[in-house]
Amino acid sequence: MASSGKCVFLVFLCMVALLAPSEVHAKSMVEVNAAHKWYIVEGLCSKFPDCNKHCKEQKFPGGTCLKLGVNMMCTCIYS
């Protein structure tokens, strides 16, 4: 039988998993052509066939796929 401390921890862990947003947007600064720009990472490019169109629909000036780590990520221009 689990102790009450373990049960409280498991309940807390389940609540965090349920309340966490399904897609977390990360804001990162990337240097492109010696200019610093802020980007919002939307997710894998495979999920967004037209990254630029998706970003414009989200009210950003535009977007592009950038290689972040080993994956190509759809990033929207923040500023």
From Swiss-Prot:
Keywords: Antimicrobial, Disulfide bond, Fungicide, Plant defense, Secreted, Signal. The keyword Cytoplasm does not apply. One of its GO terms (cellular component) is extracellular region. It is found in: Secreted. It comes from the Eukaryota. The keyword Ligase does not apply. SUPFAM superfamilies: Scorpion toxin-like (SSF57095). GO terms for biological process: defense response to fungus; killing of cells of another organism. Disulfide bonds join C45-C65, C51-C74, C55-C76. InterPro entries: Scorpion_toxin-like_sf (IPR036574). Gene3D superfamilies: Knottin, scorpion toxin-like (3.30.30.10). Residues 1-26 form the signal peptide. Belongs to the DEFL family. This is Putative defensin-like protein 29. It comes from Arabidopsis thaliana.
